Amino acid sequence: MEETVEAMYKKLISRIHREVLKPTGFKKDGSNFRICYDNGLGKIINFQRSMFNCNAECKFCINMGLYTQQDGQEPNPRFKEYDCAVRERAAHISPKYGKDYWWCIFEGRDMEKLFSELQAILTEDVLPWMDRFESRQDVIRTGQ
């Protein structure tokens, strides 16, 4: 029996966590990967599936965000990407894409090639972009 596209997606997300994001401190929560700091800054990478997915294909994009805990606010270790002060799509900041982009999994897709493509955008674009922000104040200074 061939693997479903949903199973292929889940396996891909688990591998991305294990090999790319977990070594940098991100914790997995479904399709969300978060890292929280004691200084009130949180970072999230979210894999958003298309609402139009079907059994034959699974499209997804990569969202990212910078969360800032407000003074006097209780910490929220399960913040969502839409809770963030700064939000961006991974493809928007990548010189390779520069626009909205949705990756697609389908029967026969070369998953090793797809993993390599995602690993590249995460390590070359997303994580370095996020590393520019080390504190809440860095996010506030961006004016976003």
Where are these regions (language model features)?
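Intrinsically disordered, low-complexity regulatory regions enriched in serine/threonine/proline
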Residues: 1-9, 14, 28, 35-144
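Pyridoxal 5′-phosphate
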Residues: 21
